[in-house]
Design a protein with these regions (language model features):
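Short, intrinsically disordered terminal segments enriched in charged and Pro/Gly residues
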Residues: 2-28, 151-155
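BZIP DNA-binding basic region
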Residues: 11, 33-65
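Short Cys/His-rich Zn2+-coordinating modules
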Residues: 13-25, 41, 61-72, 109-116
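Short cysteine-rich loop/turn motifs with clustered Cys
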Residues: 35-46, 70-109, 130-132
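Short linker/helix segments within small regulatory modules
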Residues: 48-58, 73-77, 110-127
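Cysteine-rich micro-motifs
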Residues: 51-66, 96-103, 125-129, 133
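Short Cys/His-centered divalent metal-binding micro-motifs
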Residues: 65-68, 126-150
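Histidine-centered nuclease catalytic patch
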Residues: 93-128, 146-150
Length: 155
């Protein structure tokens, strides 16, 4: 292989995008924008969980880090609760864990988009559920449907 052929191969390989890079490019080329952090008073973009599937978290990195460290950000109200909001049984079943027990298991609480659409990242569409209630709610409502419009996969 000549040096010229080698340079052409390197240039060609730089042009190839991974599936995640392709998905990000497609997302942005369609005019989409990342949702804003769900926390009141924060105007940062959310963290991308996985570009390949257009999967986004509900919060920005700054808010996630501050919340996990128990720090307050001036003029920002953290939306995520320190208990499962299904403690009243509004999902049609009661959360099996008592509200006062969550303080030692905060990593087992998720932010759930009620309509299943992660682009609709408004406080009235996002609730805190434990992993047990979140999984059951998602299964019952079809949020796990990989063909829903808010989910994307590039073949």
């Amino acid at each position: 292989m000549t040096e010229e052929d080698n340079e052409a191969t390197i240039t060609e390989s730089k042009k190839e995008l991974s599936k995640g890079q392709q998905a990000k490019k497609e997302f942005l080329d369609k005019g989409n924008k990342l949702p804003l952090c769900v926390n009141e008073g924060c105007n940062n973009d959310v963290v991308v969980r996985e570009w390949k599937y257009w999967s986004f978290k509900s919060e920005c990195g700054r808010c996630i880090n501050a919340r996990k460290k128990g720090l307050k950000i001036p003029d920002v109200k953290i939306h995520k609760k320190d208990f499962c909001e299904n403690n009243d049984g509004h999902l049609g079943f009661l959360c099996p864990v008592k509200t006062n027990l969550w303080k030692d298991f905060l990593e087992s609480l998720d932010l759930d988009h009620l309509d299943g659409d992660h682009m609709n990242n408004t406080p009235d569409n996002v609730k805190t559920y434990c992993k047990l209630c979140h999984n059951r709610k998602s299964k019952d409502t079809g949020d796990w449907n990989s063909n829903k419009p808010s989910r994307r996969d590039i073949d």
